[in-house]
């Protein structure tokens, strides 16, 4: 995979992660139960983040071993294949606690790769 393709996928991860964080700001966990559009939007964003992560090469992943790459991809798989039993507590916890550091790490990796 070319450096250009890697950067595109990392930018997708960054942009969709930032969007999930922005959409969840000012919301609470219970809103996932009462706001169907919020639920669907956040699930879709998490699916795309995981899909993009799954397309990042192992060489690029190795540059930031602090990112739990396999967990990001596993979340995508769980949401896609377990579409009928999404655990809102896990989804909310992931978005509110795990995405902000993921955003910073991916942004850092994009900057590193852009400078090389």
Residue ranges and their predicted role:
Residues 1-116:
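Solvent-exposed interaction patches of small proteins and small membrane subunits
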């Amino acid at each position: 995979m070319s450096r250009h393709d890697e950067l595109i996928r990392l930018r997708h991860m960054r942009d969709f992660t930032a969007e999930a964080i922005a959409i969840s700001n000012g919301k609470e966990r219970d809103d996932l139960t009462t706001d169907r559009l919020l639920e669907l939007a956040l699930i879709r964003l998490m699916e795309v983040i995981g899909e993009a992560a799954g397309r990042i090469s192992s060489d690029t992943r190795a540059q930031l071993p602090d990112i739990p790459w396999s967990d990001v991809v596993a979340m995508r798989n769980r949401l896609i294949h377990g579409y009928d039993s999404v655990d809102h507590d896990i989804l909310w916890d992931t978005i509110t606690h795990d995405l902000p550091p993921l955003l910073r790490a991916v942004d850092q990796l994009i900057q590193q790769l852009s400078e090389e």
